[in-house]
Amino acid sequence: MSRYRGPRVRIIRRLGTLPGLTNKTPQLKSGSINQSTSNKKISQYRIRLEEKQKLRFHYGITERQLLNYVRIARRAKGSTGEVLLQLSEMRLDNVIFRLGMAPTIPGARQLVNHRHILVNDYIVDIPSYRCKPQDFITIKNQQKSETIISKNIEFYQKSKIPNHLTYSSLEKKGLVNQILDRESIGLKINELLVVEYYSRQA
């Protein structure tokens, strides 16, 4: 399944706030979706499916990528759900978003694809690149790159940067301090439901 490119508002109306997908918040009309489904029994499958979709749309990953992350998480030590979230959060496009260098993860992905971003002084144009502790993220030394990202930081670096990341406005440099813990996840989600959804596939 390819990456979703349709209207983002439609997604957040169905799944709730997804800050990685869009900085808009859902505005439900009275008597709309939630009310119409409140009297219906929602199946366990649908609950798991919607939680999986939250993860996929928030991080902007394909079905194949998500299934691959689940398989990696199952082989790793520790909680499968927590490792799954760590794999998603440590993607380069998400790290750029959490640093406030882009308004959304699709915006961060565009910066990476257009070669505006360096990791450890090397251009990386793969949004799914998995960042590691002590990786540092900088801006390509070109006026266009610096202007775009400086504007993003000015307008979008409003919320507190999570503890596993640091950003130096003086050096225009982001640093991955460590692998993040569960409390630093940028999405309200029940990851165990996602793992259960893939229980027969991974």
From Swiss-Prot:
SMART domains given in the database record: Ribosomal_S4, S4
InterPro entries in UniProt: Ribosomal_uS4 (IPR022801), Ribosomal_uS4_bac-type (IPR005709), Ribosomal_uS4_N (IPR001912), S4_RNA-bd (IPR002942), S4_RNA-bd_sf (IPR036986)
Keyword Ribosomal protein: yes
Keyword Hydrolase attached: no
Keywords for this protein: Chloroplast, Plastid, Ribonucleoprotein, Ribosomal protein, RNA-binding, rRNA-binding
GO biological process: ribosomal small subunit biogenesis; translation
GO cellular component, one term: chloroplast
Source taxon at top rank: Eukaryota
Residue stretches spanning the membrane: none
Residue intervals of the S4 RNA-binding domain: 90-153
GO MF annotation, one: structural constituent of ribosome
Compartments in which it is found: Plastid, Chloroplast
Quaternary structure (record): Part of the 30S ribosomal subunit. Contacts protein S5. The interaction surface between S4 and S5 is involved in control of translational fidelity.
Function: One of the primary rRNA binding proteins, it binds directly to 16S rRNA where it nucleates assembly of the body of the 30S subunit.
Family recorded in the similarity comment: Belongs to the universal ribosomal protein uS4 family.
Protein name (Swiss-Prot/TrEMBL): Small ribosomal subunit protein uS4c
Biological source species: Sphaerocarpos donnelli
